[in-house]
Amino acid sequence: TENFEITLKIKDNPFKVDYLNYKKKEKNEVILNFKGSKNRNNELVIETFNLNEDENYIKIKDLVFNEKFQISRFDEVNLDYIDDDKQKNSIRLKRNKKKYFLTGSSFNADNLIEDLLSDDDKDTKIIDINSNLKIDVKKIFLDSEYYLSNFKGDILIKNKEIYKADLIGSFSKNKKLKLTINKDNNNKITTLFVDEAKPIVKRYKFIKGFDEGSLDFFSSKKSKKSVSQIKIYDFKLKELPILTKILTLASLQGIADILSGEGIRFTEF
């Protein structure tokens, strides 16, 4: 077994974690400390990882990478920081035997949603964990204007893929977002209903002045063939050039493929 411990202090250089939308303030100092070992199974075990910047911190316990440098398990992740959008993030992801529990008061998912919808080349297979994930977060920010309250549900992950999910959250005025995923043999059914479509649709720059409306999405995927349907109701639209209408559908289809872990592509509507 090879043991190590490293401490880094960063003050004059920039430092950021894009996935979490975390960025060090210009004149602040970030202290990174991590210790771990490499075991006989060729696994890299990070026993503790700590990032501290004033009142911001990221803490990880017993993070294990397999020989392919994929995350095979971890015991606990604690995040408490103000991100680059000035939003408060305070969540904990903790393992209890084979189940994981995500809890907390708030998390800004804006940057995460943007990455998922726009990047079809990103390798999402870095995590190799088969587990049940139970979620209970009081507030999820979708952007600077919209957020979900009491975001709860369960996700079942097998072979780096979501097999089952049932998630629900509330917008203000008692409007809802509901996502379900069910895989049976080779058929995967995905449904997404959003009472406030704007935080999703506005991310497509060729749609101008979209407001109000709800989004209803259904996808059935069997083997490599998927059939999807997207409906948007009761919305206002200032401008949508005719030549981009098909592009709109093609881009929104990316939601289905992201949820299926396949990258952005579409077969038919």
Kindly give the residue locations of the regions a language model identified.
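Membrane-proximal interfacial segments on either side of biological membranes
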Residues: T1-F269
